[in-house]
Amino acid sequence: MGLFTISCNSQDNNVAVQKESVHQFVLTDLNGDTFNMSSLKGKKVMIVNTASKCGLTYQYEILEKMYNSYKSDNFVIVGFPANNFLWQEPGSNEEIAKFCLKNYGVTFPMMEKISVKGSDMHPLYKFLTNKQKNGYKDSSVKWNFQKYLINENGYLEKIISPRTKPDDPSVIEWIKT
């Protein structure tokens, strides 16, 4: 029979959470090209799941204005089309790219269509929604246009509700500080 010891030190009550970084992810954009999140080191990043047929689709216009206003301040927006909520993103990657450009002039990086919840959730969204991975907080994607704010080191700092506009004063303050 084996012998084992259990430590009852009060300092062991807090489980250490290992933070990972978004910089570890290699993705594919809407054009089928490789996009390394490590290329965003030193920049603040807003990650947002998008949809073309949603009541919140107007946020594309705000996102594009923000991207153009703050990209010189080391701020980037990365969009992730997803069809998880009432099938509001039914198009192909090519159709999504055309829609975004034609209707909103989107120039910020847009990744290929992914799943942001469920058994086929993309690994990046597993990271964003799991405290054990992101070191910040457990969450779930509530709807299209939920925003995740990532600091210059690739760590999750804030989660913004889908209904909160991207240019909310709290977000602008976060970009500027």
Segments the model singles out, each with a brief description of its role:
Residues 56-122:
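Structural microenvironment flanking redox-active thiols in thiol-disulfide oxidoreductases
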Residues 49-53:
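Amphipathic alpha-helical repeat scaffolds
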Residues 41-45:
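Proline/glycine-enriched tight loop/beta-turn segments at coil->beta junctions
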Residues 9-38, 58, 123:
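N-terminal "domain-start" segment that seeds a small globular fold
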Residues 1-5:
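Bacterial N-terminal signal peptides
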Residues 123-126, 131-177:
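Thiol-/selenol-based redox modules, centered on thioredoxin-like
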